[in-house]
Amino acid sequence: MPEGARGLSLPKPSLRLGCGHQGEVCDCAAVSDTPTAQAATTMASPRGSGSSTSLSTVGSEGDPSPACSASRPEPLPEPPIRLHLLPVGIQGSVKPSRLERVAREIVETERAYVRDLRSIVEDYLGPLMDGRALGLNMEQVGTLFANIEDIYEFSSELLEDLEGCSSAGGIAECFVQRSEDFDIYTLYCMNYPSSLALLRELSVSPPATLWLQERQAQLRHSLPLQSFLLKPVQRILKYHLLLQELGKHWAEGPDSGGREMVEEAIVSMTAVAWYINDMKRKQEHAARLQEVQRRLGGWTGPELSAFGELVLEGTFRGGGGGGPRLRGGERLLFLFSRMLLVAKRRGPEYTYKGHIFCCNLSVSETPRDPLGFKVSDLTIPKHRHLFQAKNQEEKRLWIHCLQRLFFENHPASIPAKAKQVLLENSLHCAPKSKHIPEPPTSPLDSPRPRDAPGFTPGRRNPAPSPRLSGSRRGRRQSEPAKEAYVIFPQNDKPQVKHAGSEGELHPSSELQPVSASGLPEDLEDAGPPTLDPSGTSITEEILELLNQRGLRDSGPATHDIPKFPRDSRVPVESEPLPFQSLPSRESSEEEEEEDLETDEREPSPLHVLEGLEGSSAAEIPCIPSLTDIPSEVPSLPEIPEAPCLPCLSDISGVFEVPCLSPTSTVPDIPSLATTPSFPCGSWLPGPLQEAAQPQATRRELLSGSNPGRLSESPSESREGQEDDTEGVSFSAVQREAGTSVQGFPEELEYRSCSEIRSAWQALEQGQLARPGFPEPLLILEDSDLRGGSTSGKTGMPHSERSASRVRELARLYSERIQQMQRAETRASTNAPRRRPRVLAQPQPSPCPPQEEAEPGALPAFGHVLVCELAFPLNCTQESVPLGPAVLVQAATPLCIQGDDLSGQNLNVSDLSKQGHLSSNSIPPPVPLPGQSNFQNIQVPSTSLLPKQEPPDVQVPTASTLPDTSQLQSQVPAATPSAGHRNCVEIQVQSTTSLPGQECQADTVALSKQEGHEDSQNPNKAPGAEQRDVSIDQGLAVVGGRPVSPLPVCTSSPDQQIPATTPLPLSTDFPDMEGPGALPLPTQEGRPDCSIPCNPLPSLSQDVQVPAVIPVSQLQGLTDTRATVPLSSHKQEDAPECLGPEPSLTDTPAPRLLSSLGQQNTTDGPVSAAAVPLTEQGCSQDLQGLITSPVQTTMELPKPRGLVSRVATSESLDLTPPHSPSLSTRQLLGPSAAALSRYLAASYISQSLARRQGPGGEGTVASQGHWSSSAPTSRAPSPPPQPQPPAPPARRLSYATTVSIQVGGGGRLRPAKAQVRLNHPALLAAPHPGAVGPSQGPGGS
């Protein structure tokens, strides 16, 4: 047994440690005869022995001797500190061990403390309550004393327990057992500032001052009431120090029984001290925040308190502008837990200069200035600020805090444990910069290092030491990672201890420095958080202890005491705001700086997209947190400067989904568990990361097995994904998506349309050099990979994930951090997401679409991973082919008539039924002769009718028919189950014949009609003539009635009638009038079908026959939009892509029809694009007609399998043309992520279509109401480089699938969606007539 323990157990010493004290009252008769003097001496000696320098405040008044205790007669009749631990007979002969002295001191100091509390309650509170003095009302009395009575009662009970302990271990146990009860101090500590303020007011009043002085004299107190009121604050912050002393002297070794209890007590009380200290700091910061709010001018946002607590504030040299030089003036930075506010001092006021939400924050160091760092907004590339700190400590502190808040505000895609590991990692790995040698310096001071010794206010320090800029760049950032908490610990604990023991909340020395550093203007700051210093020491001590014990993880406070804070999320609370204020120096340069800010801001390469608010991709590289985290990796530093990748950095995303925010709060969300993916290549979402990678890499990733995998079995991938999330190898995930797409489910956050578009645009602009677009562009929703989980299980939350899983992930992150080559940021969807503008009611059908892999790996020219976090929403799964926008709207997946690929659902075919025929799932496609291919359609390789494969074919996803049952249709509902269901589905882009066929639904009928096959053959028909009937609306309603434009296109595949033939058809359509009006012949309601497929020769003109037309019947034909754009020209490869627009087409459709009637319907690729068909003169008319809602139409030059997007549109409702929007909405449902995907897909497809068009003679002007998301101008992209005609074999396809499922507990699993575009055709030389029409607002 440790010597101390033995000594304490000795009966004579009456180790009831404090028995003696209370003993007087209790039982120590023997002690009573002992002279008080002896007691005093004994007490003094232990104290003098240095048992604890922090214990200097033992006396009730702080006097070394207990003499003043005389005033406390009743309860403590005898001198309060009378206790003798030495046998009376041998006083002085045996010296108490250090452990005994410490234990005794704990009890003695508690007795003195309780005595002081009683004096406050009985001698001050009592008289004031009686109204005998000062005339204070009850409210003022409550403010002055708070819950002092409760504290007195609690402390009296604690004292009794301590006095009843017979060993040091027993004392420790008392604290452990009552640790939770100490929270009563929280209220008192938070009220203390108010109490002090009231007391000061009273001191100004002569009567009050006189009464207080008289009272002090009567009580013979050496200290005023103010000092007594401070004692509870000091005491609560001293317990952990006393216990640390106890543990320090506890004998080490096998006999050290009870040590665990002591350590537990230390941890518990340290946590209490930290918590109270933190609460106190928060209160002070809240007061400061109010002050800032009052003085801040030019701020038009909500109350600053809405952005969380004020974590740090400081004064820096610098300002806006991304130029290489620091421009003049001084900037005040106020770091809130959710936002960084930049202001400028103007006299006593602050002028608002800008703000950046923490979720969009990017921090990077400036290589040329060792003290400089740049803060930028990922969503607004031009919004950058360059600052110069006063010293290294301040810089490190700020960078660390900024990084930490970035992670904390990140969309919860990173588990809390992983975030912690990342930050800790950076802290531990970060080598201290040369300046840092003063590591001990408390970060507090550093921020204020008001006077960092070498710092000259105006000095720029332009030449950064190479060392610093290089390695530090990445690491430095992490260094600060010590976290405020850690930093605090760095403050000298001795200082803290002394301060605490002496009763000064804030060691004056520390406070002074801080305040000094702060300018008077920051008077608010001047008051250092009284607790900060102590907090620091506490943290430091805890860390020390935990490190020694190896408890670091469990210990409440290790360096990371922050853990507590972390969990509590006390953002850097540990850092006292005090750092904040730095001397202000106004500079005449300020104005200059301001002027330059604008100029220097570099325009975002993506700024062109008016809709992209957040195309801040450029800034992505700078994401501080990411870069920092990897800071260990020297290369990271470079990252910040990496060119802006179009990556989805636009976190801002176009939509803000309130519901998403909750996700962010859930660090543990299992889905997040996938975090392992993070380690993969970067923290960034796959897409970002990928974007960052050289294109080649991207290609390899995608073109390699990944594409194959993706295309081959989405379902498998999904399953795999689930597994991965479950803990399956993350590496696999990484490999798969190149960015661990699979692993991302959690991580994958919902990507805003703007992000995706930004990425795409960057690709388009050639930012990522790429040979052309020979490879398909894959936009995979995280679960694309796992396409198999049609069941939707994929989306189920992995709530069951255990903590061990979290730890594993954290470990993986830590290991990967050093491997990261790039740090990219992923958009924080969390932050301000915009609400999807027009989300329609979500489709209830939960059926997950089944996606089919397209045959063969697609060349990867680009791959963007789009992921969606689990939303608190309930969404239904939906699949939507993003066809021309119009189609999309119709939501009918065109999927190429063929059966759904997998025959999954013919739903589409049912489309006509619209009713979410998903259930319908029409019989598997009956491939028409020509169509048989359709089934394969999905597979690019599929023969697909020549063109037949509907563009949608594309895809697997295509299958999704948005409207259709949303999903499911997945496919191509195409299977025209009925004989021509295909047609319907068809869409058949291939329907070159389309022109002729044009009538979507008709087509279907057509399909039956002999022509179906033919249409299938459209390519055969060379379609050249066909141009794209695209009549998106195929059914356009003429005169408001659905008319199925059958562009007859006489050209049947073979016929190839030029389609010029105007369809008289139009007229027939009118009959259709109702969307459903025309009975579809066989169509089965495949309004979508749009299949232009059948260019039955005869049909051609005749086709227009209502019969075909019955399309209208398609009932949704109207809606249909069915763009069916057939590009006659060789549609073969027409990249259908184009048309993803949502297609408000509906409306246009009608117009279209009419015009069609006038002209060939055929031509009118109704798609809003109204792309002039080369051959079909009518296209122009159509164009006019169409208002473009249709956009989808695209003329694909020779797109062989013209996209049949068209069909898609039809869909749902037979509702009148207006319905389109409906379908669109349905598709999206409440899922903002799905919406953004659709919009992005629409944009991309339009972009591809534009590429197609030679000059795109007719750029589609039309845009859907979604247009905002898509660039308004549709200028045809630069004419596609002349390319050899698209390989006839290639077809253009595009489809998306979104699956959102509700898992147990009502939690949604991440939505999974897949969008694939095969645009090789685009590369092909655009058909002269072809135009890339569609641009429509993004699809759905």
From Swiss-Prot:
Compositionally skewed regions (Acidic residues) per UniProt:
588-600
Q: Which residues carry this modification: Phosphothreonine?
A: T441, T1215
Low complexity: compositionally biased ranges: 45-62, 1319-1333
List cystine links: none
* SMART domains for the chain: PH, RhoGEF
Sequence ranges assigned to domain DH in this UniProt record: 98-279
Q: Which SUPFAM superfamilies match?
A: DBL homology domain (DH-domain) (SSF48065), PH domain-like (SSF50729)
Positions of modified residues (Phosphoserine): S446, S465, S1219, S1269
Q: In which tissues is it expressed?
A: Expressed in thymus, skeletal muscle, lung, testis, uterus, pancreas and heart and also expressed during embryogenesis.
Where are the residues of the annotated region Disordered? 34-76, 431-623, 684-743, 820-855, 907-979, 991-1028, 1047-1069, 1125-1146, 1250-1340
Say if the entry is tagged with keyword Phosphoprotein.
Answer: yes
- Example GO biological process term? regulation of actin filament polymerization
Any Pfam family from its record, for instance, is RhoGEF
Q: Which key words tag this protein in UniProt?
A: Guanine-nucleotide releasing factor, Phosphoprotein, Tumor suppressor
**Which stretches does UniProt call biased (Pro residues)?**
1276-1288
Question: What does the UniProt record say this protein does?
Answer: May be a transforming oncogene with exchange activity for CDC42. May be a guanine-nucleotide exchange factor (GEF) for RAC1 and CDC42. Activated by the binding to subunits beta and gamma of the heterotrimeric guanine nucleotide-binding protein (G protein). Involved in the regulation of actin polymerization.
The identity of this protein, by name, is Pleckstrin homology domain-containing family G member 2
Supply the source organism for this entry. Answer: Mus musculus
Q: What are the leading ranks of the lineage? A: Eukaryota, Metazoa, Chordata, Craniata, Vertebrata
